Design a protein with these regions (language model features):
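Active-site-adjacent helix-turn-beta-strand microarchitecture at beta-sheet edges
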Residues: 84, 117-119, 305-466, 477
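Short, solvent-exposed loop/turn and secondary-structure capping segments
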Residues: 123-124, 190, 211-216, 258-260, ...
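SAM-dependent methyltransferase catalytic-core segment centered on the flexible catalytic loop
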Residues: 165-169, 184, 190-245, 253, ...
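Conserved S-adenosyl-L-methionine
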Residues: 222-226, 230, 255, 477-542
Length: 542
């Protein structure tokens, strides 16, 4: 059977399985390769049941059919599978070896460090308790590795509600869990029940700054941290649903290494963004820095399968945009629509004929007050306040309408196929201030779309949130609210296996999400369980 016919045969076979075919008919190539490399029984059974696939990708070894997953992976990765013009080079960009194979596929060039092929238990229970541990090699110490990865029995459960603490006789599937203990052991123990069910993972792991709580094997501190993170991220990925995502919060010390590690575990194709978060202002820094003052942390955002992930638009409050500087007076006849500068409209609304009258009335206050009054006027009259601007990537039709509007000197309306109407005036498109209005936290406000630079969340005064304190690294509840709302819906499952004082769980609880939190350090009176009890009792400090 020639290769092109085999491509077609395989494509038709895979399209019959909803796991590999989207609603629009496109095949999920990455998932097919992933299932092949992990020898997913469903895929192997499908292939084995087809005589042509059986002949192409299986070898009979004394009556046992052995699947050649590498041959299959190369076949599926070929540019001719699922279309594409012919080229001797592959249809993606990347570093390749002399044989033309990508280094990420051949694994001849990867991020390496001492003890990468080992497992680090990470048994530290107090922040200041330094600990030397053995790196268990997966080949040389399989029994110890199996001991760490085999499911453990959770014990000593207690249930908390508004009536207080209760003994647990039965756990339902909808329970929120706070697990006290080693997070590596906990992740592997959660697999049987929760594999493929978690919608969002957020973690704020030790930053490995040398002064934080990561206290393992100082001689190999960097390697210890990478091994520690790799072991846990690989286990966590198995818990994510196909529509799930992970946010890893970090600072600059390990940013580039954790990014490369996440690329290898979740796939470069599933990286969404690296978000920069402003966490402080220069005013509080008294030490002399060798460079710019460090006020930024980073959140790495990955999906399990980007094609399956459902992105939500998110908005953030902003101040008045001075480009919205005209007030539109609408008449029934669009040819008679007129425009007034917003400053003049604001003055008229206050009973002033000229700005000089306002200056005489308010004196030195006027310069500051004027801007505040214009912003307030725009907010109160958002349906009529507009900006004339150049659209982003206009179509030829839009370009023609803009040119026409400049020539005729009045507003032109254009109804699009979806029923919405666009307006053009003086060579530009009208943007209405009302389109920037959203309701956030119950208040109507001026907004813009969320970007990958987050400076809208205050980190001041968060020490008292939740009624607990954390010496280092406490995160604002509004930060977690932003992440949880943009990636999940009510009743979705959220996981944080570096729970700390419980911010993620507290916010998830308030937003009616289910959650699992894991923490092995003992924070005493500032423990996550204390915080969750406060939330149950109506805490509103976040």
């Amino acid at each position: 059977m020639d290769k092109l016919n085999l491509y077609h045969e395989l494509e038709q076979l895979l399209r019959m399985n909803s796991r590999y075919c989207m609603d629009d008919g496109r095949l999920l190539k990455n998932r097919i390769v992933e299932d092949a490399l992990s020898i997913q029984p469903l895929l192997v059974k499908e292939l084995l049941g087809n005589e042509k696939m059986k002949k192409a990708f299986f070898t009979d070894v004394e009556g046992v059919m052995v699947f050649d997953k590498i041959k299959f992976q190369r076949f599926v990765s070929d540019t001719q599978f699922l279309g594409g013009s012919y080229t001797m080079f592959k249809n993606k960009i990347g570093l390749a070896n002399e044989n033309g194979r990508f280094v990420s596929e051949s694994r001849e060039v990867v991020l390496s460090w001492p003890y990468k092929d080992c497992m680090l238990e990470g048994g530290q229970t107090k922040e200041d308790a330094k600990r030397n541990e053995v790196f268990w090699n997966e080949t040389l110490a399989p029994d110890e590795v199996n001991r760490l990865t085999e499911p453990k029995v959770f014990s000593n459960f207690k249930r908390y509600d508004k009536e207080g603490e209760h003994q647990v006789e039965h756990l339902s599937d909808t329970e929120n869990l706070i697990i006290k203990g080693n997070n590596l052991l906990a992740l592997h123990s959660l697999k049987k029940k929760y594999a493929g069910q978690v919608k969002l993972i957020y973690i704020d792991p030790p930053y490995n700054t040398g002064s934080d709580e990561f206290g393992y094997n100082d001689s190999f501190n960097h390697s210890s941290w990478l091994t520690f993170m790799k072991n846990r991220l690989e286990a966590a990925r198995m818990l994510l649903s196909d529509e799930g995502c992970i946010f890893v919060h970090i600072d600059h010390h390990e940013l580039f290494y954790i990014g490369t590690l996440l690329d290898s575990i979740f796939g470069v194709e599933n990286k969404v963004q690296v978000i920069s978060v402003k966490t402080a202002t220069p005013a509080g820094f008294k030490t002399v820095n060798p460079g710019p003052i460090d006020v930024t942390e980073y959140i790495l955002f990955y999906t399990k399968h980007k094609n399956s992930f459902k992105f939500k638009k998110a908005y953030v409050p902003v101040g008045y945009n001075v480009n919205y500087n005209l007030v539109l007076d609408k008449n029934e006849d669009i040819l008679k629509w007129t425009f007034t500068p917003i400053k003049d409209a604001m003055l008229q609304s206050l009973g002033f004929k000229t700005e000089k009258e306002a200056k005489d009335r308010y004196g030195d206050m006027w310069k500051t007050l004027k801007n505040q009054l214009i912003a307030q006027y725009a907010f109160n009259h958002a349906d009529n306040v507009v900006s004339v601007r150049d659209p982003h990537k206009p179509t030829e039709k839009v370009k023609s309408l803009m040119k026409q509007s400049k020539e005729v000197g009045h507003v032109i309306a254009y109804e699009k196929e979806d029923g919405t109407v666009s307006y053009f005036y003086n060579g530009g498109a009208l943007a209405f201030y009302s389109n920037k209005m959203q309701v956030i936290d119950g208040e109507r406000c001026v907004t813009e779309l969320l970007t990958d630079f987050w400076n809208h969340i205050s980190w001041a005064g968060i020490a008292k949130e939740g009624g607990v304190k954390l010496k280092n690294g406490k995160k604002p509840e509004k930060l977690l609210k932003q992440i949880i709302e943009m990636t999940t819906n009510e009743r979705d499952l959220v996981l944080d296996f570096h729970l700390g004082c419980g911010t993620t769980a507290a916010v998830a609880h308030k937003l009616k999400r289910r959650y699992i939190g894991v923490e092995q350090l003992d924070y005493g009176k500032n423990d996550s369980t204390i915080r969750l009890q406060n939330v149950i009792n109506g805490d509103n400090t976040g």
